[in-house]
Structures are given as C-alpha cells and as structure tokens.
C-alpha cells in the first residue's frame, strides 16, 4: 500500500510531515513515496491509497500551484475515483479558486472549489480548535495569515465547536469532496486525533488499525479535548 507525499521539501511547516511519520510508525507495510517539485508525481500513472500535502510558505504556494496546474485533469479523475487526499494547513488554498494578496494581486489556484483566500501578512491568526467529524471529536490548532471565503454552500470536512471555520463568519471548516479532504487545521492532525487516524487507516484499506503508542495517544487526545472545551481557555 502506497502513500504519496507531495513536495515534502517545501510543504513541511508546523511539523506537518509528522502525520506521515506516524502512519509509517503505526503501519509497517506502508510504502511512502516522496514526490519533489522536480519529480513527475506518482499519482500521474498510479493510484496511491492516500495523497498527502501539508503547509508551506506563501512563496512556495505559487511554486506548488504552478506544478500541480499541469495535472488538474488527473487530479480531477482521482477525486472522482474516490482516491483519498488529506490536505492540511494553507495547502487547502491551493485547490481553491484564488488567493488575494494585500497589494490586490490575485493568484489563480487549481479551482476545484469556489473559495477565495484573503491574505493579511501583518496579522497572523492563531487559535486552538475543536470540531466534529461525523461522530469523532477533532482537536488541533490554526496558525495562518489567511481566511477563505465563498458564496456557495460547500460540504465542510469539520463542523467547528470552538474557534472559527474557514473564516470568522462561519463554523464550517475545510471541505470534503468524495474522499478529498482539506482543512486549515494543523496539529499535526493525525497525531493529535487517533480516532480520526484510525478511521482514515480503515478507509484506505488497513485491516489492523492499531496505532503506535495508541494508549498514550488516546490519553493525550482526551486530555486535550477536555482542556480545550473549558470555557476559561481563550481561543484567539
């Protein structure tokens, strides 16, 4: 079973690559394919069990958009074929419509969903996060210079319980299209949320979903959830 990690040399802020290290630590038979910006993506001719991409700098967003724009048709095919994608942090914006910079410059993105990200590089948004995925509680963080906006009703990945969603005016966080899942929430997401990680492992075909250090991970997850839900804790 193969997982493709897109551009780990640049999409590695906030420890996001630990998501993949944790999967590999938990499931020894996984093969991790790291695709660099100069490589032909593995997904171009194959169907990985999971495609992952994490957070990057604003400059590198433009490099990644330029690279992936060549493969929009293939990415659309994979989404339609229910291949699993997990996209975290500001990588969410890559697959949206556009990014508007402070100088009004517009960066066109891949346009798989109708979101406009608005940058404010003088004000970083930091927040604790609690949300809901089906019947699973989600905990994590947000740390970003952007919020995303849309005039359309999207299918959110998470329903926010505490913090905000894609922007301060909505509780809808992220997006889910078939098995394509993208969210601003970081953590690393899979380490902080073992129930979600076990769900994802089962989804991609892993039979024994026992995680590395599962007992400790669950203890930390439950402690963090209870702590984040206390009203005395300020979110942002």
Which residue ranges define each predicted feature?
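Beta-strand-turn-beta hairpins that frame and shape the catalytic cleft
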Residues: 1, 134-138, 175-181
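A structural signal for short, well-ordered beta-strand segments and their strand-loop junctions
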Residues: 34, 86-89, 142, 184
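Structural motif
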Residues: 50-54, 86, 182-184
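Cysteine-nucleophile active-site neighborhood
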Residues: 56-133
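Glycine-rich nucleotide phosphate-binding loop and flanking beta-alpha elements
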Residues: 58-59, 92-94, 147-149, 189-191
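A glycine-centered loop/beta-turn motif at secondary-structure junctions
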Residues: 167-203
């Amino acid at each position: 079973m193969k997982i493709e990690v897109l551009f780990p040399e640049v999409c590695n802020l906030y420890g996001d690559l630990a998501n993949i290290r944790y999967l590999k630590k938990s499931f020894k038979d996984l093969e991790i394919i790291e695709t660099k910006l100069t490589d032909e993506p593995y997904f171009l001719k194959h169907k990985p069990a999971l495609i992952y991409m994490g957070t990057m700098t604003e400059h590198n967003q433009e490099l990644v958009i330029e690279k992936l724009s060549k493969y929009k048709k293939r990415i659309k095919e994979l989404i339609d074929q229910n291949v699993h994608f997990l996209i975290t942090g500001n990588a969410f914006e890559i697959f949206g419509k556009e990014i508007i910079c402070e100088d009004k410059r517009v960066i066109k993105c891949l346009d798989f969903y109708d979101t406009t990200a608005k940058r404010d590089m003088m004000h970083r948004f930091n927040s604790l996060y609690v949300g809901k995925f089906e019947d699973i509680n989600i905990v994590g963080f947000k740390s970003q210079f952007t919020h995303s906006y849309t005039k359309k009703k999207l299918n959110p990945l998470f329903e926010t319980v505490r913090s905000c969603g894609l922007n301060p005016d909505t509780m809808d966080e992220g997006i889910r299209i078939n098995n394509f899942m993208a969210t601003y929430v970081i953590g690393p997401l899979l380490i902080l949320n073992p129930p979600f990680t076990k769900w994802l492992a089962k989804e991609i075909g892993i039979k024994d979903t026992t995680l590395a250090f599962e007992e400790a991970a669950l203890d930390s997850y439950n402690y963090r959830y209870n702590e984040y839900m206390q009203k005395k804790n300020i979110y942002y």
